[in-house]
């Protein structure tokens, strides 16, 4: 089909496709960043029976800054819900000697959380497994609040909905120097999981622009 089109038409069509994809990618990324930042405004529910802190990669047994913000958020919320348990979820990744859950538990204990209040889920290797494995440790009727980073809420909540988990989500603020990498990475993860939405939007805009041309 393209062989029968003039070179100018093919060039115009290629430019239109590139411009449309570029516009959608930029616009959706901005929306994603705005939504992610707005999740920080969400407060902890009045009744909480359990907190679930989603893990992140640890190095040399130390809690990295992004994960520390999640744990600090959970600690602050727990102070007003001290009857609640805290589940820390994360397995052994990247040839680490300890699971993310063990490192997270040690951090919580060092910051005043009683060891008896902490439950370790030490097998999960990704967000989907974090939620799936943790759900096996929680009774269906319990009120659960998931604590994760602002950039991570949208994808984690989408997974929870797919699993039928009616949990609340609160987020911690990502340190500025980690924002570019973490926000773009999770945005690309959302496109990967919902590629049909992105492709559909692209085709729709192309059709509109083609008609209006």
Model-derived regions: residue spans:
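A structural signal for short, hydrophobic/glycine-enriched beta-strand patches
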Residues: 11-15, 19, 27, 31-182
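Alpha-helical transmembrane spans of integral membrane proteins, capturing the lipid-embedded, hydrophobic core
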Residues: 17-25, 29, 194, 198, ...
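Juxtamembrane "helix-exit" motif on the non-cytosolic side of transmembrane helices
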Residues: 2-9, 211-213
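Membrane-interface, cytosolic juxtamembrane amphipathic helix immediately N-terminal to a transmembrane helix
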Residues: 176-195
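C-terminal single-pass membrane-anchor helix
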Residues: 189-213
